[in-house]
Curated annotation (Swiss-Prot):
Gene responsible for this protein: Nat8f7
Organism name: Mus musculus
EC supergroup of this enzyme: transferase
Membrane protein topology class: Multi-pass membrane protein
UniProt keyword annotations, A-Z: Acyltransferase, Membrane, Transferase, Transmembrane, Transmembrane helix
Positions in coiled-coil regions: none
Name this polypeptide is given: N-acetyltransferase family 8 member 7
Subcellular location(s) of the protein: Membrane
Length: 227
């Protein structure tokens, strides 16, 4: 296990942070593809369209081309989902990380370094909702490089956010993560985050039945002592 050090973000980290974030999101493309492939409506298309074409034309070549087209379309949709998410983040809060996360005492962005390389990242900022009865901090952009998984780095990054929230007087830490991010969900729930609901942010996510899972960690809960 290589040693790592968690510290606050610096402007010189921007390129390595973006690369880590992009690679982390691209890892979810195969899982998204498999999820869409196994949906009942997809299986129906994979059976129905080629069969209809064969009965109409008698051409096995046309059947193979139709199956290939369906597979490529599913892969494109899976790839598009995560590429769109990356571009959206890079043009909003991650366009200027220093301004978004480092210009206020109530928000922060951390990186994990190992042997001079950026191997982890996580961010946090307050939830701005005047209707909230509790002061909430939102955890965002948790990512750990593939080579440093299963070393406890993900948990250490989350604990960093929880400790920061506690010091800043927040009552809860909240986050949203895709149901397709299986490892992240297991990590959060294993650390005491509780599911509070599901949200479909796009028509495509509703179509493929892959909601965002909303989670909450109460800093007044029994788990607080584990920080």
């Amino acid at each position: 296990m290589a040693p790592y050090h968690i510290r606050k973000y610096q402007d010189s980290d921007h390129r390595s942070v973006v690369d880590l974030f992009r690679r982390g999101m691209e890892e979810h493309i195969p899982a998204t593809f498999r999820h869409m492939l196994l949906l009942p409506r997809t299986l129906l298309l994979l059976l129905g369209v080629p069969l209809t074409l064969f009965l109409a034309s008698g051409s096995w070549l046309l059947v193979l081309l139709s199956i290939l087209t369906l597979f490529l379309s599913l892969w494109f949709l899976a790839k598009y989902t995560w590429e769109k998410h990356v571009m959206n983040c890079l043009h909003t809060d991650m366009a200027d990380i220093t301004r978004t996360y480092m210009s206020s005492h109530s928000s922060c962005f951390w990186v994990a370094e190992s042997r001079g390389q950026t191997v982890g990242m996580v961010a946090a900022r307050p939830v701005k909702d005047p209707l909230l009865q509790k002061k909430q901090l939102q955890l965002l952009h948790l990512s750990v490089s593939l080579q440093h998984r299963r070393e406890g780095l993900g948990k250490a990054m989350v604990r960093t956010v929880l400790q920061f929230a506690q010091m800043q007087g927040f009552s809860e830490v909240v986050l949203s993560t895709s149901m397709l991010q299986y490892a992240a969900l297991a990590l959060y729930q294993g650390m005491g985050f509780q599911k509070t609901g599901e949200t479909f942010y796009t028509y495509l996510s509703r179509l493929r039945k892959s909601p965002m899972i909303n989670l909450k960690y109460s800093l007044t809960s029994p788990w607080e002592g584990d920080l």
